[in-house]
Amino acid sequence: MKQTRIRSDGPISARPDADEATATLDRTWLSPPGFVSWFTHVNHRKIGYRFIVTSLIFFALAGILALMMRLQLMSPENSLLGPELFNQFFTMHGTTMMFLFAVPIMEGMGIYLVPLMIGTRDMAFPRLNAFGYYVYLTAGVVLFASLFIGMAPAAGWFAYVPLAGKAFSPEVGMDVWTTLITFIEISALTAAVELVATIFKQRAPGMSLDRMPLFVWAILVMSFMIIFAMPPVMTASVLLMLDRTLDMQFFVVAGGGEPLLWQHLFWFFGHPEVYIILVPALGMISMIITTFTRRPIFGYTAMVLSLVAIGFVSFGLWVHHMFTTGLPHLGLSFFTAASAMITIPSGVQIFCWIATLWGARIRFATPMLFILGFFAIFVIGGLTGVMVASIPFDMQVHDTYFVVAHFHYVLIGGAVLPLFGAIYYWYPKVTGQMMSERLGRWSFGLIFAGLNLTFFPMHQLGLEGMPRRVYTYLEVMGWGSLNLFITAGAFILAAGFALSFWNMFISRTRGINAGPNPWQADSLEWATASPPANYNFRHIPVVRSRTPIWDDEAADERQLVTGLSNERREILLTTVLDAEPQGVLILPSPTIWPFLLAIAVALGFIGIIFSPWWFVVGFFLSFFMIVGWLWPRRPWQEE
């Protein structure tokens, strides 16, 4: 095994050979420039950045669809959108938000930040990382292309059978949905496997499991949840595709199938997905609160255990969505208990944050404002969640706008607000520029006001009986005034998000130079330049506490690992529990094979919509691409 050493003899950059060694590292870890070379990048920061930017674009597109639906619903018997187009917009909005925005952007944040936070130079499988992004991008582009050519799915983002079956949805749109959902989840699974391997085996020496940043813990829990939650929805979408294309009748009662099987498979994924989205946001909140209170998080162990508990308990909630399907009430009672029980670890998180904030001199910068807004919105969403966990109450409000209100309070308040706080927080690290505080405060104010103006009145609509998933309603129902008010609120909410997008855009060129650690934070990503070099760290740091930067500043010294080659893409491997140095792994260089493999797999998946023979074509093309990917190369061919 190659030997590495730990030294603490002052700043390495002060040595005479530092410039030459840095230049060698720059050449070794270079990401090729140019448009064609864009398809060969494997660096984790570039791939993570692409995930984040692409997800935000899909978020904006889903928002536009939502505004169009609100315009349709702002007055009774409106004819702006017909029922078919409304159903397409509704399906595309939900599918985009759940599959193309929420999970990918959380994975993208993990891909970008986790290697920096744990003190390593790249992900465990860089080419697999790139492959996952190209799969995700291809699926998203094809799904939105289906909308523009009139082939979009229209049976809802949940694709309930028999409505999503061939008999009631004969159009090709649902074939597109079933195929692309399976395809998209390949991307999610590749990222999850990579993140687990990277976190367990590439932490800097000394970063034992009980010293990991809470965001890294959150990403680890999220990754394991993805590994267990995504296969059921992939199985369900494949079975539905076989029903539609080969008349297999898994969900057709006349053929011996069972429609409720779809709901069991889908919601076994669907409810954990809410927490797949939420758990990384909880980690973001902890990192931001630590920085802006200038104190370690209160109850670190309790915070970690509550994250793990959320991951476990979330898999026992799927029948929470099926209280009105006729299942035995004795069985439903257990899911009511589980639905109430998951509030306990969530409450532990909130009380630990409050304890950290209590008595602190808080800096009320924009990231912190988004976190404080989260507290108010998420608590409301959590309270209504406990309400719909009660079977008698759920029977009354199921499939009404009360559930729409609850759902959006939890996901926008619980995930999107912390996410935008995290974007303001880590934007200086990614770009080297600070975002405008003035625009950030205005954006937060509009988002917070617009969110409440849009979704709080929906509780009342639901209690008055307005069903969700309808494209119009009669004037005599008396829902017109509230819907008009909600539509106005939706445009205020959209203006808030648009202001943040504008802030991101102009700050790239007009923002103040950030420096390496503008927030005076404590975690390792702030020990690098902004933006970091392609290799992240000139020397791998040694971690001695949960707040390494603060403690190194107090001790006025910093221990570093030496011995890794500057001429090869080497990373340090450490033990799983205590992060003791164990070995060195040589990573592959940039290549176009992940992009070509993604295209080959896409041809097989998308082509099968029109002919089974495309699967054969995609299979053989994928085989040749994998051979090219894995073909051994001599050292000079890796340059």
Where are these regions (language model features)?
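Membrane-embedded and interfacial regions of multi-pass energy-transducing membrane proteins
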Residues: 2-639
